[in-house]
């Protein structure tokens, strides 16, 4: 009977989810559609600020990065939305000059924004804090600027191997370039710092829409769906065997016991639900195979800007997306994830997940834990955020109202989960 109830609930939810999410997320979640529509009509030129405007930042405690790049190359980055050509540049941080670097735009939809997200590429002989690349995300559509930073902090607090993230100031050719979100790149250094040294790392790509751990036909199919970030000279055989075992198993508990770091995966699922990360089902995550230590697979979060509500059409008031979103009966706007579907099909695992979700809801995803973090971030970024809004006009609006919106989301998401978790327990 519990499984029947579970299935019935799922079927009832399907139409609600599809209708609701069509309001929340448009075809912009699908890169092919995004390119067809030719985003957006915004003026790519930033507003030049008078030199004295930067005096308000004299006491800023934010890390300051400086980028020097030929003006024609900077213009190319700002106007060529989907070009991936990196341009020569020089980068300075903490008083240290990194010569021979390259810079380009990064991201998918965000490439269409006037204020581009940036990827800084370093010489392998002169890495930046151990990394060969640096991600500086735009935050142009986030009224609070800090959703990504907070999302990575929540994942880490829940016991997930997640990137470090912080707010930084960027000077470009001697002038204020903007307030950016620095996100640590998952790479060899990232893995070593999290006891995953030597792991094989795959990035779930948005190119194919199939990076949802489904079983694919051949090596070329996996190449299209996933990008290998470490051990690049090796084949995709390990990933193929994992997805094959997932598709063919008749014993879900045995599969997860053999292949997956189960506690970390439960932590990942719980954090994903807490922050309402709906954009990870078939992209925006990494898979790491820890061959040297546990012999298990780990899921690592990525691209968390569309959490705590969604900036696509500014639906930050939506805090009640379903707990089981991303499964076959309750798909998200981009589809459903095969690993999550298999996990939630097993009653024992569902109970373990709900237990952990309840625990984290009361221990980590609380106003007592998160509001002070938001207050500190708000104080630190306020002067730079004000200048950024002038330099890069857009839809995001007032920072302080944006921070209040994140706080409101947290309260409403907590209230929803406190109501919904008991309902899900009864259905099992």
Predicted regions mapped to residue ranges:
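Phosphate/dinucleotide-binding and metal-coordinating scaffold of catalytic cores
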Residues: 1-428
């Amino acid at each position: 009977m519990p499984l029947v109830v579970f299935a019935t609930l799922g079927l009832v939810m399907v139409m609600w989810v599809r209708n609701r999410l069509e309001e929340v997320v448009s075809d912009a979640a699908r890169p092919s559609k995004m390119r067809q529509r030719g985003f957006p009509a915004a003026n790519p030129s930033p507003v030049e600020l008078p030199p004295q405007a930067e005096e308000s930042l004299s006491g800023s405690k934010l890390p300051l990065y400086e980028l020097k790049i030929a003006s024609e190359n900077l213009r190319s980055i700002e106007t060529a939305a989907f070009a991936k050509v990196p341009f020569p540049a020089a980068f300075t941080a903490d008083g240290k000059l990194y010569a021979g670097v390259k810079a380009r735009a990064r991201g998918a939809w965000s490439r269409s924004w006037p204020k581009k997200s940036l990827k800084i590429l370093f010489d392998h002989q002169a890495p930046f804090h151990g990394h060969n690349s640096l991600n500086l995300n735009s935050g142009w559509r986030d009224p609070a600027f800090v959703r990504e930073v907070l999302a990575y902090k929540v994942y880490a607090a829940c016991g997930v191997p997640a990137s470090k993230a912080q707010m930084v100031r960027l000077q470009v050719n001697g002038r204020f370039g903007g307030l950016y979100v620095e996100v640590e790149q998952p790479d060899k250094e990232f893995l070593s710092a999290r006891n995953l040294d030597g792991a094989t790392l795959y990035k779930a790509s948005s190119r194919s829409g199939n990076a949802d751990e489904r079983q694919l036909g051949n090596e070329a199919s996996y190449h299209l769906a996933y990008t290998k970030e470490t051990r690049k000279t090796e084949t995709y055989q390990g990933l193929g065997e994992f997805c094959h075992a997932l598709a063919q198993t008749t014993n879900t508990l045995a599969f997860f016991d053999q292949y997956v770091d189960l506690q970390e995966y439960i932590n990942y699922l719980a954090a994903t639900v807490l922050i309402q990360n709906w954009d990870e089902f078939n992209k925006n995550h990494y898979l790491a195979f820890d061959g040297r230590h546990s012999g298990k697979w780990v899921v690592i979060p990525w691209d968390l800007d569309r959490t705590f509500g969604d900036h696509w059409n500014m639906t930050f008031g939506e805090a009640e997306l379903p707990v089981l979103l991303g499964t076959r009966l309750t798909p998200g706007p981009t589809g459903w994830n095969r690993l999550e579907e298999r996990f939630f099909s097993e009653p024992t695992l569902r109970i373990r997940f709900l237990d952990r979700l309840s625990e984290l809801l009361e221990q980590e995803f609380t106003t007592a834990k998160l509001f002070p973090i938001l207050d500190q971030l708000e104080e630190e970024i306020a002067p730079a955020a004000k200048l950024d809004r002038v330099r890069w006009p857009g839809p995001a609006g007032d920072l302080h109202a944006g921070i209040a919106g994140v706080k409101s989301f947290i309260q409403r998401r907590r209230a929803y989960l406190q109501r919904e978790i008991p309902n899900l327990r009864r259905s099992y």
